[in-house]
Amino acid sequence: TPERQGSLTGKVMQKTVLVTGCSSGIGLESALDLTRQGFRVLAACRKAEDVARMQELGLTGILLDLDDPQSVERAAAEVIALTDNRLYGLFNNAGYGVYGPLNTISRQQMEQQFSANFFGAHQLTMLLLPAMTPHGEGRIVMTSSVMGLIASPGRGAYAASKYALEAWSDALRMELRHSGIQVSLIEPGPIRTRFTDNVNQTQSDKPVENPGIAARFTLGPEAVVEKVRHAFTSDKPKLRYPVTLVTHAVVLLKRLLPARAMDKIIHG
């Protein structure tokens, strides 16, 4: 259970986890599930009205805009104060997609994509690590994507940010190998969430896949929640959690096929 015996006081202390991107979908469902598992959950959202809604759901709301370095600093300071400098877990889940052919995406759009999906997560994690490393235990879980394993036309910006997150997580895992902190990646394929509401499509963007085909392999947020729960509660969390048949297929095909063959499968 997410409780431990205090070494000096004998008190049983509840473990605290920060979850980002809690306004809906994977973040919200995971936050509620981790609460049911016995964790104290700090639920970070970008909008003040969503933070207020977290309070109504029995969660501790935190205002956090990963695109704003000062907001990240304020949120990290609030988390450290609320946890008395003792944080058990961090679920870096927030993010959004900039979709469209690369020749339609400006430098500013690309920077915003990386700011929200990568730089913000890096800054937040580094600010919170001092509240985790002294205690000899902890979990850092990252929401990546099948697009962190394979790129496709029209999704280059999003895929690039997730590829970066994959490499960063691998490096962090090895750097923390003696700390007791475990690092895991969640790699969802098509999931029914409000994520598509946060997609910033360029004006010449066109659908890059047949939605009818994708729909057949789409799962609900609960498929991801199950993996998140395992990553935070298992004695032996996995390094990577592929979610949906699409992700499992991509992992297998990348091992078996040359790059040009993969291009044909993706692009036709």
What are these regions (language model features)?
Residues S23-S24:
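Conserved glycine-rich cofactor-binding loop
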Residues T125, S161:
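Active-site helix of classical SDR
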Residues H178-K238:
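SDR active-site lid
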Residues N103, I150-G156:
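Active-site loop immediately N-terminal to the catalytic Tyr-X3-Lys motif
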Residues S145:
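Residue(s) in the substrate-gating loop at a strand-loop-helix junction
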Residues L64-R74, R107:
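The beta1-alpha1 cofactor-binding region of Rossmann-like NAD(H)/NADP(H)-dependent oxidoreductases
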Residues P101-L102, Q109-E111:
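Substrate-binding pocket helix/loop in short-chain dehydrogenase/reductase
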